[in-house]
């Protein structure tokens, strides 16, 4: 059984990881 809090936590981590990846990529390409 997956709780809403776990889903919310996973989504937040994925969002932060995506933002960090985009910022890192843009920094490398500059």
Curated annotation (Swiss-Prot):
GO aspect biological process, one term: photosynthesis
Keywords: Chloroplast, Membrane, Photosynthesis, Photosystem I, Plastid, Thylakoid, Transmembrane, Transmembrane helix
InterPro entries reported in the protein's UniProt record: PSI_PsaM, PSI_PsaM_sf
Gene Ontology cellular-component annotations: chloroplast thylakoid membrane; photosystem I
Membrane topology: Single-pass membrane protein
Keyword Ubl conjugation: no
Segments passing through the bilayer: 7-29
Subcellular locations according to the entry: Plastid, Chloroplast thylakoid membrane
Sequence similarity: Belongs to the PsaM family.
Protein name per Swiss-Prot or TrEMBL: Photosystem I reaction center subunit XII
Organism of this sequence: Phaeodactylum tricornutum (strain CCAP 1055/1)
